[in-house]
């Protein structure tokens, strides 16, 4: 880290390109200079040459840029990764942290939806299991006037798992957003949330 998910996306894109698909250009946004430099180094080391690292705050990315697909791996409280009886984790988790993360998530969602092309898809994910950072954030931003009736939620699926099988095999928490996945932390999994959104117009 950083760059694990970006490297996986680049590898999948390269595999599709070898199979005859069009070349793909990937943009990774990182606002903190040291992490941006490390991200660029890690990507180069992994041979992910199709990736451009943009050192910018994604909340302020210019509307000039338009994207076919977006992974918004939002900063969060990390509530899905906390272990029971971990005093350090408990000390970090405060109402102030939750409020700060929730505000950032909504701003990032708003901008990502703005720069997503019609017909494009976005995956919103966090390593939190709190509704305030997950389904509530998504509903609130999608309900804003500028986004109303422009987007739809899609059921999650992977190349080897359809949505029903995915939901059957993961330890899920109850979620008020039917299309989303909220995975319960276990010995085998860290907790996380994800939902896929498509821009219809």
Feature map (PLM): residue ranges:
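S-adenosylmethionine
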Residues: 1-201
């Amino acid at each position: 880290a950083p760059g694990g998910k970006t490297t996986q996306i680049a590898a999948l894109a390269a595999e599709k390109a070898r199979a005859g698909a069009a070349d793909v250009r990937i943009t990774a946004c990182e606002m903190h200079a040291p992490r941006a430099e490390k991200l660029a180094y890690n990507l180069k080391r992994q041979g992910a040459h199709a990736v451009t690292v943009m050192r910018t705050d994604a909340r302020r990315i210019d509307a000039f840029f338009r994207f076919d697909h977006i992974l918004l791996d939002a900063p969060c409280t990390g509530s899905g990764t906390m272990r029971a009886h971990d005093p350090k984790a408990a000390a970090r988790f405060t109402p102030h942290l939750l409020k700060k993360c929730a505000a950032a998530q909504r701003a990032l969602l708003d901008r990502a939806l703005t720069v997503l092309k019609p017909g494009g898809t976005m995956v919103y994910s966090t390593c939190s299991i709190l509704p305030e950072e997950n389904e509530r954030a998504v509903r609130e931003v999608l309900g804003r006037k500028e986004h109303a009736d422009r987007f739809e939620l899609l059921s999650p699926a992977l190349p080897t798992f359809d949505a029903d099988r995915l939901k059957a095999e993961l330890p899920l928490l109850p979620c008020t957003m039917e299309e989303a996945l909220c995975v319960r932390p276990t010995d085998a999994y860290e907790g996380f949330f994800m939902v896929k959104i498509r821009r219809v117009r």
